[in-house]
């Protein structure tokens, strides 16, 4: 007896603990309420658990742990704290305490399920009160509430009727036990488990429910009528195409299907889950429909976008056909069921026509359509508001994902999308036309550019519209093909069509799917290559043949780049007087006759007259202090197709002519003025050697130094830079198969010459070279002044000698004191002038050496190895290096990295010794 009493005390204590825990859990969920409201909630919870514990245990609803997690998630969303802890943490502690008690697991699962319903209903009530539509009940929670409420109501009605079961125990006994206020009555029965789980007999139960009423058949009552099953299946079929049915309604916010609140109680848990699962196909169907509707604004744009939309509509039409077959099959079976006829002979793409259509069969059927609709939705979603090549590239990215069905689907979509693109390409490369209303073609025509700039600037690539599967070299070929056709038609006035044009167009448009092939060896790529080669050859033959492109390039090299040496020398000799005049006094009409005379007096007279007619001399606008050398230049004028090809290079020739003309100017000053004047005056001033010998000697040395520098510069520029690169250009032009190859080689030739002529280098190179030229001009001025003073003194001495000779003839010997004093004064002034002249010459020489040193330093630090080697050759005997300490210093590591002169075995390279093991 003592042991039974102790066990009873333990059970009572455990029941009290469980009751307290449940009370606190309800407070966590509902909050602190009035006592009568709290007791009512406890009473309702006790009834629900007692009535539905078996239903919860046998169903496939949420597990106990999932219920706890959902409760904590809902409580965490409230952001409410009690005594420094959140409500969810407090509930978690209470749940851990409950698991430590001797509570039946099934009863605890039922308790957590009902607490989840209570939490969800509490949040829903708060959301309605605050008019916040964002909080919605889960579909499965709705199923749970509906099922449990319906079962509870059934049990309550049985209690009122007093129906007894087969064992003579009234249903009121169940509710009587469950109606005990508080949780002790619930948990008391659950706590007795194992050996202590013997059922106690209650004598009051035998006197309840003795009425003479028969017990209904619950198994037959739970069976569903065929019409109800058919309605459920039809609701699922309707949802495939986005149509709402009896059991499935659309959520206006998410667009997904949810169970109907009124009819959810007629569904089992399995049926509800399968309906929600099947309705996913309708959700993705609606997404595809939205993407294929141009009025929504979520679809792709342009003609290629229209092709994608058309393909999506075709996919939807095929899907609708499959769903229609399911619907027809369901209607036939329904009619056969009504008529009592089993139609088992027919078979369709859906389930067998002779068998009943069920949700399980629909689940087996809908997998492939769902997979296809999901990928269509993903692809269409990625293509929103895209067009042209960008649209094609987006779809192209979905290829090769490892699924054969998806690869085939993407290939079909790409084939449809590339149809307009292939037609635009074929029209461009066969006719030279652009049919692009939506600006989705990767070739664009610039309307503001004139015909004279057609070849270089009229047509460009629109890189954002270039598909990923069209490589850049193929895009350039397509661009050049259409551009060549426009060039032949609009400039060369060639109206002939391409050979086999119709056949090429037929091949290209019939093989649109080959445009995104991984290997460019398809018939489509071969057709594009054929068009490119034929058009390029036609343009090249016309430009090299009738329009003499190569001859004109040779003419510009000889006259604008001073390759015809005798011509430029005679031209300067003819215009030397005009070149020294002020710029305002020079007129182009006077120079034209001098140009013609120079052409007739040199080997240029044997050139093609068509080439010579393009050569002209121009006078630029003069500025203050400009002379003829600064404003006179040669110009090569081109017209027609040549202008379209070469007009863009004319500014480069103009830039190149300036340093070459400046170099010729310095050569003319040194040879025809300074040196020639020195040689002519040396004999005349021989008698004054004692007075001017020092200055003359320094002048001769300085002149030789400058002439060596200028001659080296001319040799390097005219031969090593221009001539050598011209030879390379001729080789490339002979091997060229397209006009673009010639133009690209010519452009590279000009850019190389720009570097070799010190034009496109650092500003310090060009500036220091200009300082050298300015010192040469200063030397010319100094020499003119020097010889002027020398000849003035020489003439004074000769005049004095004549006076002495005349006096001797007259018999009067000697000079007057006045004459002697005047002569001595003039000699003294001349000596002072010679000293000043010597110092002035040294200043010019010093400035010259400084400029040359700066020029050499700039060459040594240049990025071009040829300029570095040229700097080394200019100072081959280290003359300037010995006189300038900066040139003797090693280059910094920065310049050593930029330099390509120093080899691996150079002493400037730091070599780490190899470690020996």
Swiss-Prot record:
PANTHER family: GAMMA TUBULIN COMPLEX PROTEIN, GAMMA-TUBULIN COMPLEX COMPONENT 3. Belongs to the TUBGCP family. Keywords: Cytoplasm, Cytoskeleton, Microtubule. It comes from the Eukaryota. GO terms for biological process: cytoplasmic microtubule organization; male meiotic nuclear division; meiotic cell cycle; meiotic spindle organization; microtubule nucleation; mitotic cell cycle; mitotic spindle-templated microtubule nucleation; spindle assembly. InterPro entries: GCP, GCP_C, GCP_C_sf, GCP_N. This is Gamma-tubulin complex component 3. Its main location: cytoplasm. One of its GO terms (cellular component) is gamma-tubulin ring complex. GO terms for molecular function: gamma-tubulin binding. Disruption phenotype: RNAi-mediated knockdown has no effect on nuclear positioning in fat body cells. It is found in: Cytoplasm, Cytoskeleton, Microtubule organizing center, Centrosome; Cytoplasm, Cytoskeleton, Microtubule organizing center; Cytoplasm, Perinuclear region. Gamma-tubulin small complex (Gamma TuSC) is a heterotetrameric complex which contains two molecules of gamma-tubulin, and one molecule each of Dgrip84 and Dgrip91. The gamma-tubulin in this complex binds preferentially to GDP over GTP.
